[in-house]
Amino acid sequence: MKASLRLRLDQLCDRHEELTALLADAEVISDNKRFRKLSREHSDLTEITEVWGKYRQAEEDIETAEMMKSDPDFKDMAEEEIQANKALLEELESQLNILMIPKDPNDSNAAYLEIRAGTGGDEAAIFSGDLFRMYSKYAESQGWRIEVLSENEGEHGGFKEVICRVDGDGVYGRLKFESGAHRVQRVPATESQGRVHTSACTVAILPEIDVDTNVEINPADLRIDTYRASGAGGQHINKTDSAVRITHIPTGTVVECQEERSQHKNKAKAMALLVSRLENAKRAAADAATSEMRRDLVGSGDRSERIRTYNYPQGRMTDHRINLTLYKLDAIMEGDLTELLDSLHREYQADQLAMLAQENGG
């Protein structure tokens, strides 16, 4: 292992010890915001600290066994010990390499899930509803909570657009590779000739950004409108102007929230979504400027970037970014996304490791 990597791992262990002490400090405990921030950092460093500890212990065990080899009575046993620990070192070093991949600070955050019908008319809206159900089922299996912020229902079912907040531990990190265009190939219920139609929906996953965290929005840049929330068929959900639409004038970004009966709650939720949209756009622009030449599995979230095809006649789902095809479409649409998401994360880790190796001269 390189000396520079050892030094970095020792520094991280020192920081972990420092955080452990800070989290026991009464002053830190009384400051909820600081306590949460430090707890998250402590949690992020715990695994890497434990693995590094095991690595150093294995090295010590090899040294001890090397000394034992000089005694004929223990030579064979010492050799076995050395070989076992060398194999363990390889395994632990692989784990450390993965753990050293720079983490997106937003990975542990809640996320906004936005699904919009694209080409395909009514069938695209129906498929938007199918995707929403798929993600809802997966969220339920993870113990996450989904809260719909706004929805525009399709005339024959599904959604022209649905925006929701997904709350839970590590939601954004788990779902961030879902942004892009999702294509469906199937025979619509309204198709009398049995022909397969192709439709598309777009999915966007945005990390929730803490409104109080280094985000400055000039109130003069906002236009806030209220209106009556409408359900399917234009029926009024309530008779007060509780729904809120906020427009960020400089960027033209528009957000809405209509699900709460309280205008105040709708405004707060719309504002949180606006902050996340603006911060995500800013980050995407920065990423584009600094990483034009490298492959990025996460993608830009560009709605024209086709990432996946759901083919119903063949019962398959294909993710085009990693050339993965799974013949279990029914299970996937019921929220069984574990194999798919794990595959995407493994590919991302492999990309990052290759990039780190290149940066470190192999």
UniProtKB/Swiss-Prot annotation:
Provide the record's note on post-translational modification.
Answer: Methylated by PrmC. Methylation increases the termination efficiency of RF1.
**Primary residence:** cytoplasm
Q: Which PROSITE patterns match?
A: RF_PROK_I
Query: Which UniProt keywords are listed?
Result: Cytoplasm, Methylation, Protein biosynthesis
Which Gene Ontology terms cover its molecular function?
translation release factor activity, codon specific
Q: Where in this protein does the record say N5-methylglutamine is found?
A: 235
User: What are the record's GO terms for cellular component?
Assistant: cytoplasm
Tell where it localizes. Answer: Cytoplasm
Question: So which domain of life are we looking at?
Answer: Bacteria
Which family, according to UniProt?
Belongs to the prokaryotic/mitochondrial release factor family.
Functional note: Peptide chain release factor 1 directs the termination of translation in response to the peptide chain termination codons UAG and UAA.
- HAMAP family xrefs: Rel_fac_1
- Protein name as catalogued: Peptide chain release factor 1
The organism encoding this protein is Acinetobacter baumannii (strain ATCC 17978 / DSM 105126 / CIP 53.77 / LMG 1025 / NCDC KC755 / 5377)
Name the gene for this chain.
prfA
